[in-house]
Amino acid sequence: MIQELKNFRDREARRRKWKKFMVLQNPVIVQIAKEMPETPEELSCVKGMGTAKVEKFGNDILRILEKWK
């Protein structure tokens, strides 16, 4: 799951021409994997996942997590 989240981050960074850390930092990815949020609200409680990131990436992240339940 962590690798899939990193792959998502890498794709988004390339697509947006951003640095990887601007999409998701490694510690945030690990925390998402530990907490396994199920809703955008739960995802926004993960340290490092502010409102803007949840709005931009939340649905995609939650879809990835859904596969691992």
Ranges and model annotations:
Residues 1-69:
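Accessory DNA-binding and partner-docking regions appended to nucleic-acid-acting proteins
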